[in-house]
């Protein structure tokens, strides 16, 4: 491969050196069985990805991906890929090193510099660099890069891509143990001894004994310290509540939170709107608005916020809800970022088992069904069926319960949605059911 030129990080060029690649692979596969065979396989497959003018970064990534594509055949390649990726991260953030002792020293030397500089640039909370709160030298001495070996490749790459702090330019400024210590410090501001508390937190995370949620990993210690991971929104059947729910979704997603949004109270399409003497468009277009809001604040290069819209399967627009995640159809009635989930009752499953019909209603006419579960739901649902059959309910549809259940399962198989949520089982076992259904 003498005709291949590699462009180094400083812009200089040098011929591709297969011996350097082999030495790197030998180090990454140290202690593993079939070391020589694995090195030879990766080195041979790497040749297929090379081209003249390849950069050091591209070469590193090609080496890693060559190892990753072999994980399906031998899990030892996962270890090799993780070690190669860690080596790349260390060099990007800390610089060159020759052994584990030097690597640990670099961690200890660079950590206080990283904290102070990031706080100065506004990337971290200024309290992180406050000497009255934290002894940075002591925290740096507690860093243990050997703990990185506990993580699989997926853990290392996920931390790099989603959670590790970066500058606006995209340049990484955290190695994995910097990330763990930053999180530990961000959770220790209000402790009696923040330094000792941070070290204790850190050790549990480094040993994989405790792993905080995604929002905590992204935001702890940062200038936007939103640490909560999960939120619940119930959209009421009025324009103010709908608009507020979209706004709340945007701000929660900005902070990487996950949201469960109940859309079940929104009246069905065609239901009268008295204030404007028109008909409602139903809940589907508003779900599309939430979907667009999620995309607009998706935090490129970081963990994104996520949301799932929930609907009960007696809603008159449930068939349109089932189609939200389909690839074909009107794009204004499809969601690409908003997940969907269906609340399924025991009453429905009994009707599936018994081959009975299932009635769909407009929430505007059966508003209390949303708040009921178990036997109370079944009794009230059956009362509404009698009212419908007596023509005392204006808008309803009747479908075979088994037919709808097949539609749900077909959609789940085709799109992965809607997620099945067993309403009665959850509410009967909920420890905080005093807060509502």
Which stretches of residues belong to each language-model region?
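Extended catalytic cores of very large enzyme megasubunits
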Residues: 1-437
């Amino acid at each position: 491969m003498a005709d291949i030129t590699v462009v180094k990080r400083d812009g200089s060029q040098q011929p591709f050196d297969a011996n350097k690649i082999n030495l790197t692979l030998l180090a990454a596969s140290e202690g593993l069985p079939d070391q020589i065979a694995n090195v030879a396989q990766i080195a041979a497959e790497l040749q297929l990805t090379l081209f003249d003018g390849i950069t050091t970064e591209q070469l590193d990534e090609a080496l890693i991906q060559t190892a990753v594509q072999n994980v399906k055949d031998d899990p030892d390649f996962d270890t090799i890929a993780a070690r190669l990726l860690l080596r790349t991260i260390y060099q990007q953030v800390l610089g060159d090193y020759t052994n584990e002792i030097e690597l640990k020293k670099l961690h200890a030397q660079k950590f206080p510099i990283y904290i102070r500089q990031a706080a100065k640039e506004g990337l971290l909370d200024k309290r992180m660099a406050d000497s009255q709160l934290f002894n940075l030298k002591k925290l740096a001495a507690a860093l243990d890069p050997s703990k990185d070996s506990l993580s699989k490749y997926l853990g290392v790459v996920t931390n790099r891509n989603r959670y590790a702090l970066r500058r606006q330019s995209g340049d990484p400024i955290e190695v994995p143990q910097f990330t763990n210590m930053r999180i530990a410090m961000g959770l220790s501001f209000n402790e009696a001894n923040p330094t000792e508390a941070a070290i204790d937190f850190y050790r549990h995370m480094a040993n994989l004994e405790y792993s905080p949620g995604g929002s905590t990993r992204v935001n702890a210690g940062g200038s936007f310290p939103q640490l909560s991971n999960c939120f619940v929104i119930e959209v009421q059947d009025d324009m103010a509540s709908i608009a507020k729910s979209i706004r709340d979704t945007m701000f929660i997603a900005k902070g990487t939170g996950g949201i469960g949004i109940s859309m079940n109270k929104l009246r069905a399409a065609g239901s009268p709107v008295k204030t404007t003497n028109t008909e409602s468009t139903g809940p589907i277009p508003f779900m599309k608005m939430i979907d667009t809001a999620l995309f607009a604040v998706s935090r490129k290069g970081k963990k994104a916020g996520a949301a799932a819209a929930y609907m009960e399967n007696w809603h008159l627009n449930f068939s349109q809800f089932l189609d939200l995640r389909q690839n074909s159809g009107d794009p204004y009635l499809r969601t690409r970022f908003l997940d969907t989930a269906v609340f399924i009752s025991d009453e429905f499953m009994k009707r599936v088992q018994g081959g009975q019909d299932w009635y769909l209603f407009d929430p505007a006419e059966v508003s209390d069904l949303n708040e009921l579960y178990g036997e109370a739901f079944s009794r009230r649902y059956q009362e509404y069926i009698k009212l419908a059959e007596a023509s005392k309910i204006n808008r309803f549809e009747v479908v075979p319960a088994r037919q709808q259940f097949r539609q749900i399962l077909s959609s789940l198989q085709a799109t992965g949605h809607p997620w099945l949520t067993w309403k009665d089982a959850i509410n009967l076992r909920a420890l905080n059911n005093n807060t509502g259904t």
